[in-house]
Amino acid sequence: MALTASVKEELAHLQVRKSAVRAAELSALLRFAGGLHIVAGRIVVEAELDTESVARRAVRTVGEVFGHECELGVMSGGGLRREPTWVVRVARDGEALARRTGLLDAHGRPVRGLPPTVVNGSVDESAAVIRGAFLAHGSLTEPGRAAAMEFTCPGPEAALALVGSARRLDVLAKARQVRGVDRVVVRDGDTIAALLTRLGAHRALLQWEDRRMRKEVRATANRLANFDDANLRRSAQAAVTAGAKVERALDILGDEAPEHLRAAGRLRVANKQASLDELGRLSDPPLTKDAIAGRIRRLLAMADRRAEELGIATTTEFAAQAGGAQARAH
């Protein structure tokens, strides 16, 4: 499965309990994937999505949080679009939903960016805004020099609002216009990893970082000619970062983590260059690639949740800080 699809599928099944956070996510999703239409003199809210599970998540939120009935349809792919498009539509209570999600202001005028209540909400709501925008029109490219998390925006005001939400999460995002289309882009690999963590895409993060490490190690290995120390340090950096995150998780959790998760973590720390397949074979008893990946993912997720409760650096933030300090030392 492509990275973008993996992230969307995982986020579509993320459990969120707070109604305000769910509302912020839906507000961004409708703003970035939808629009307001006048049909027979009535306002209709409509959003077009490329993933069925995302569309069904939106339908549930409309019903459970706002209490409105929602239609879900599908348009078959045609022309340049091969895949079907899922259409979420609220007709009978369209105006009420538009006002409550901030698509319309108090005077009934369309909001061009994002509503102030969402922009000025909590940090969790800021993360929900970015999650909703990604589910609507986000993409994640393969790790490498051109790695990017990108959001296609309905206009410059929405792009600037998204940049502001990212800033509240200490994430550097840049708004730009490409061929008349407004976009928001996050480029730095460590920043992308941190953002995936904040959005709740822990499984996709593990997949992305595994690919990132392999690509960086392969790229460096191809450049090595004389195997000098400086090049060897660069070739090992990605593996060291992955190991540092797991070490951080073990430090944060200590004995709080279940033994089988600690064992998987210790195995990763002791074999930083090994692939997930190799780690699985080294386990006692042997595990599948998915099983060892799942254990490491759960260990990191538990540690990140605990770190946020304690107000200390998460595994990704710690690894980024350690990498920066090491780079300055050299």
Curated annotation (Swiss-Prot):
Q: Which Pfam families match?
A: HTH_WhiA, LAGLIDADG_WhiA, WhiA_N
The record's Gene Ontology biological-process terms are: cell division; regulation of sporulation
Q: PANTHER family annotated for this entry?
A: CELL DIVISION PROTEIN WHIA-RELATED
User: What's the protein name?
Assistant: Probable cell division protein WhiA
Name the encoding gene, please. whiA
The cross-references to InterPro entries, in alphabetical order and at most eight, read:
Homing_endonucl, Sporu_reg_WhiA_N_dom, Sporulation_regulator_WhiA, Sporulation_regulator_WhiA_C, WhiA_LAGLIDADG_dom
DNA-binding region of this protein: 275-308
What is the organism of origin for this protein? Answer: Kocuria rhizophila (strain ATCC 9341 / DSM 348 / NBRC 103217 / DC2201)
Ordered alphabetically, the record's keywords are:
Cell cycle, Cell division, DNA-binding
The Gene Ontology terms for molecular function here are:
DNA binding
Q: Which domain of life is it from?
A: Bacteria
Protein family (similarity comment): Belongs to the WhiA family.
- Free-text function comment from the UniProt entry: Involved in cell division and chromosome segregation.
**HAMAP family, from UniProt?**
HTH_type_WhiA
